[in-house]
């Protein structure tokens, strides 16, 4: 615990909450929902602001605690109340105004849910969030994660390839607008969108210094860059080894490309990349970070 007292628990019941989609029987700490503004600037956690009092906001401003990472989801107050299942969630957006006026650096996040906050609602959210730039320095758009444990929860559907292409078109259009106005791309799509749409990853300069890396924005591009740089600094040799790399299904093709780059310098090393199917959480979960020991 990096705090002097207990963590503040979440007062929301978000329709997309991953903790609500976990199976029973795991360790107790995995079921704790935090929504603590102190963890935002200390550890980079995203907070909804519904748990922050006016006194908390003024303390952040007084001590200039930043950046504050805000989980927006929607800029439509009524829709935000619905998504967070909290009647105060819409009013909590007014706290963003106060942070903006005080010059507190912020990053934003939108967990996109099909048929809920995408399409016209996403367009409205991006339009409204753009007004906070460059104090709000970046916003990530990530697709909702859906496990097989959703009985009794809001009926959400996975995005299709066509959906992903439409989301990227919106984001790329806003990136161009924001770059021309502020010199930053501002809004960023997580890597999943590009993979799902079958489109190439953006070049490194489009990520504005990887401000949203922990949200899966630019992880694959950064990995590719780091592998190429590391290989370029080595002479290579003829050692014989067999290397097995386990990863999630989403990243597997990119990990294979990285292994091919390494193999050019180390031609006698045999690489095998194994894409792990997620049986624990369900096949819709394809990221490496949610692979469990039993699936390995």
What positions do the PLM features span?
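Conserved Radical SAM active-site core
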Residues: 1-135, 143-174
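Auxiliary Fe-S-binding modules of radical SAM enzymes
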Residues: 131-132, 145-296
